[in-house]
């Protein structure tokens, strides 16, 4: 499954179908990866279903937007590499899921089936098999001559994972079939759901607590995780159950039943557990009655479900109806609304995530909902809190969304605590809410750094990335990475121990560590984890690992400036942007003082990125952390004078256009430069000097200049502009052969590594990009080039092999023919 990056701004609007479809694909693929591969879904099923249906409708309306990686062509998630792959003889297709669970939804499905079968009002009702939609992990069990020979997960619907050894530990699943009428099929694939009963889940968590181990979140994820344990002994410790509900490949079954219901009866006779909560019903009204009956008893069931499934009962009619795309026409799943309950908000706090995201959280009077006791519920972000107007003291509806993530759905306003307005009529007092609306804190509750929220983003973030303890582990992991400071040997386990055992409070502390610190840390970590290394048992202390680690830390003290900037973890600053900063501004001293308008003058730096960089360096705690690194001996290499090409970007007209003055376009900025030829003159410009500008632009500019902060920003920009002009050489350096060109690398080159090729291209002035577009000048393709090569050919982008790239690099500047 492809990995996608989180969008830098909100989703594209629906009036931009191509961009909207691309965004939907990226979101759905990310959610599917979390759900099927990581077993850590971040959104409820209802959100995935909503986005999926939107993409499906969009691709129906615009067939040209469907791409090979579209989730509408898939059934589930990717196969984990630890298990052998199993190709399903008959694909394990998913059933269409409807969120319209009213009577109209069931009737609409019945009407669709009748229409497909060509039935009219005079024909009898269609018979359906109605059953439960279990909340577990789908499994295919293969029996040959009556014996279990293989068990596989759904995987992506075509290829699953071989989990036979783990499935054999589930006592409900027969290892051999019981003959029916003295017969078992030659080949029988039975499909069903592995799940965990609620009481078994509670007992398992009780055992975990007794052992002092981490408890599990919910039965579904616990069951899925158990099936995918590499050690079958660990899987055997989890109390798993199974229900059969369908068939895969079948061969040599004498007297195979003619209906789905009778097929389940025979599976039960073969020895498979089949849920008793099922029925054969007539027509849409029968489906509605079944749906309502199960809804009424849902909470009393011994296991979790998230809906019901309707299937045309006749197997012959199923074959006649067939499939549409990835789903059968003869079946549909109807979900129930997520379970909800009323409770009271005791307080609203904010949590700081490992990447600095600030999330409001409602602390609740404990309430039992969705099978668990909920004490906290996410409020998502500042906009959501304001939209719902959630306040302390409110009675709220809490939903265990997707049966996983508790959230506040809405406020019961008529129960909001009120106070009398002071001084109002004694006999007819006016009232006002007792508690004020929620306000996001201006500073991080963990470290005190400023909280910033980028324009167009819903999430606010702590700006103290180098300082904030909530972000400390993530900041160090990034800082030490191979493409950043490349600290050899400093892996995740050591970072966790250094932070958790209080050896490292800031990144600079890495460079103060001693051999004794590492050895003591290892000893304390082993004691905490109950581990006794063999060397300790033998009366020895291993030191080589610590010596190597210290050498790796010391060796990282002189990184190239661009890599050092990348290592700081500035939001939106990747390798390419870090290189741009280093190449154009030349020194850390210049970069850490550059305001957003100056940064906007650099190539490929947009408003969002410029603001993120400026915000990072504007945070005093980040500056302190940076100074601490320099004092610890870190010395970025390759600093130089500012790039002379920046001179034209520093013209007043160019800078005026980057100030962010409303209505001051690039054209108006040039007019303004005539009236105010220098930044100092702009700071004190008089209205009569702006007669050449439209009245609305003049008014907007004067309002902007009335701000003390804006005038201070202008003075800072003017001073730094003067320093840059004084420091830069009189003429630009000689251009490289690929100066200003965009190149994409794809596939495996015969002699050069990807990093080596990238370095050579960048040395020649090229920008190395990760994706092919109309702006790409060259694609350098090696073996197994894949989709990027296909995209280049589609866009008529020139394609080079390694030899062609090397030949191009030898040409004189300006000659790329």
UniProtKB/Swiss-Prot annotation:
CDD domains, alphabetized: BRCT_DNA_ligase_like, LIGANc
Assigned keywords, A-Z: DNA damage, DNA repair, DNA replication, Ligase, Magnesium, Manganese, Metal-binding, NAD, Zinc
SUPFAM superfamilies hit by this protein: BRCT domain, DNA ligase/mRNA capping enzyme, catalytic domain, Nucleic acid-binding proteins, RuvA domain 2-like
Broad enzyme group: ligase
Chemical reaction(s) catalysed: NAD(+) + (deoxyribonucleotide)n-3'-hydroxyl + 5'-phospho-(deoxyribonucleotide)m = (deoxyribonucleotide)n+m + AMP + beta-nicotinamide D-nucleotide
Residues that, per the record, bind NAD(+): 45-49, 94-95, 131, 154, 193, 311, 335
Positions with a binding annotation for Zn(2+): 444, 447, 462, 468
GO molecular-function terms, A-Z: DNA binding; DNA ligase (NAD+) activity; metal ion binding
GO cellular component, one term: cytosol
NCBIfam families for the chain: dnlj (TIGR00575), PRK07956.1 (NF005932)
Family statement drawn from the similarity comment of this UniProt entry: Belongs to the NAD-dependent DNA ligase family. LigA subfamily.
Protein name: DNA ligase
Organism: Ralstonia pickettii (strain 12J)
Record gene name: ligA
């Amino acid at each position: 499954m492809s990995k996608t990056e989180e969008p830098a701004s909100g989703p594209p609007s629906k009036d931009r179908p191509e961009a909207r479809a691309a965004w939907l694909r990226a979101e759905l693929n990310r959610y599917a990866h979390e759900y099927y591969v990581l077993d850590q879904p971040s959104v409820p099923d209802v959100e995935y279903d909503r986005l999926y249906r939107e993409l499906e409708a969009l691709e129906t309306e615009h067939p040209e937007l469907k791409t090979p990686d579209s989730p509408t062509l898939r059934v589930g998630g990717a196969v984990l590499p630890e298990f052998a792959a199993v190709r399903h003889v008959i694909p394990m297709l998913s059933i269409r899921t409807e969120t319209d669970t009213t009577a109209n939804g069931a009737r609409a499905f019945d009407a669709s089936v009748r229409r497909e079968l060509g039935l009219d009002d005079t024909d009898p009702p269609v018979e359906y098999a109605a059953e439960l939609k279990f909340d577990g992990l789908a499994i295919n069990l293969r029996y040959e001559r009556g014996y279990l020979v293989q068990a596989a997960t759904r995987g992506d619907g075509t290829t699953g994972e071989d989990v036979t050894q783990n499935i054999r530990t589930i006592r409900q699943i027969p290892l051999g079939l019981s003959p029916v009428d003295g017969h078992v099929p030659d080949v029988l694939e039975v499909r069903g759901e592995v799940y965990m009963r609620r009481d078994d889940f509670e007992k398992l968590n009780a055992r975990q607590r007794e052992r002092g181990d981490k408890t599990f979140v919910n039965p579904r994820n616990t069951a899925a995780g158990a099936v995918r344990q590499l050690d079958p002994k660990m899987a055997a410790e989890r109390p798993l159950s199974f229900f059969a509900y369908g068939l895969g490949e079948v061969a040599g079954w004498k007297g195979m039943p003619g209906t789905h219901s009778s097929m389940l009866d025979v599976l039960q006779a073969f020895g498979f557990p089949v849920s008793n909560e099922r029925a054969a019903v007539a027509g849409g009204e029968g489906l509605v009655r079944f749906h309502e009956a199960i809804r009424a008893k849902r909470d009393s069931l011994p296991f979790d479900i998230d809906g019901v499934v309707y299937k045309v009962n006749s197997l012959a009619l199923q074959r006649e109806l067939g499939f549409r795309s990835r789903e059968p026409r003869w079946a549909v799943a109807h979900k129930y609304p997520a379970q909800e309950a009323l409770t009271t908000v005791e307080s609203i706090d904010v949590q700081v995530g490992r990447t600095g995201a600030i999330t409001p959280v409602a602390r609740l009077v404990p309430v039992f909902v969705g099978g668990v006791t909920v004490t906290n519920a996410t409020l998502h972000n500042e906009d959501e809190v304001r939209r719902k107007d959630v306040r302390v003291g409110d009675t709220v509806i809490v939903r265990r969304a997707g049966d996983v993530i508790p959230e506040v759905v809405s406020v019961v306003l008529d129960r909001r605590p009120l106070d009398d307005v002071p001084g109002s009529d004694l006999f007819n007092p006016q009232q006002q809410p007792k508690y004020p609306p929620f306000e996001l804190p201006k500073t991080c509750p963990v470290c005190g750094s400023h909280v910033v929220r980028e324009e167009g983003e819903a999430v606010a973030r702590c700006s103290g990335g180098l300082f904030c303890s909530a972000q400390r582990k993530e900041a160090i992991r990034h800082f030490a990475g191979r493409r950043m400071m490349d600290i050899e040997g400093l892996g995740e386990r050591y970072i966790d121990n250094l932070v958790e055992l209080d050896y490292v409070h800031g990144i600079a502390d890495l460079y103060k560590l001693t051999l004794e610190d590492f050895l003591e840390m290892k000893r304390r970590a082993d004691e905490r984890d109950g581990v006794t290394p063999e060397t300790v048992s033998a009366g020895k202390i291993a030191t080589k690992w610590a010596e190597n680690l210290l050498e790796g830390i010391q060796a990282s003290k002189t990184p190239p400036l661009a890599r050092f900037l990348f290592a700081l973890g500035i939001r939106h600053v990747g390798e390419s942007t870090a290189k741009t900063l280093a190449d154009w501004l030349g020194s850390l001293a210049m970069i850490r003082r550059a305001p957003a308008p100056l940064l906007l003058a650099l190539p490929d730096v947009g408003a969002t990125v410029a603001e993120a960089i400026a915000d990072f360096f504007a945070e005093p705690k980040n500056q302190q952390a940076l100074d601490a690194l320099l004092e610890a001996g870190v010395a970025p290499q390759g600093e130089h004078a500012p790039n002379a090409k920046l001179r034209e970007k520093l013209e007043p007209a160019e800078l005026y256009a980057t100030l962010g003055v409303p209505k001051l376009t690039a054209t108006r900025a040039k007019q303004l430069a005539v009236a105010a030829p220098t930044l100092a003159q702009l700071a004190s410009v008089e209205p009569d000097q702006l007669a050449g500008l439209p009245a609305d632009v003049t008014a907007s500019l004067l309002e902007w200049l009335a701000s003390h902060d804006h005038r201070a920003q202008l003075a800072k920009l003017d001073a730094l502009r003067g320093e840059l002009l004084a420091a830069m050489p009189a003429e630009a350096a000689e251009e490289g052969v690929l100066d200003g060109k965009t190149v994409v690398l794809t596939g495996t080159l015969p002699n050069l590594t990807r990093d080596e090729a990238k370095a050579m291209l960048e040395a020649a002035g090229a920008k190395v990009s990760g994706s092919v577009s109309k702006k790409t000048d060259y694609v350098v393709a090696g073996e197994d080039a894949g989709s990027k090569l296909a995209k280049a050919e589609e866009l008529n982008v020139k394609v080079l092999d390694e030899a062609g790239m090397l030949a191009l690099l030898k040409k004189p500047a300006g000659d790329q023919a």
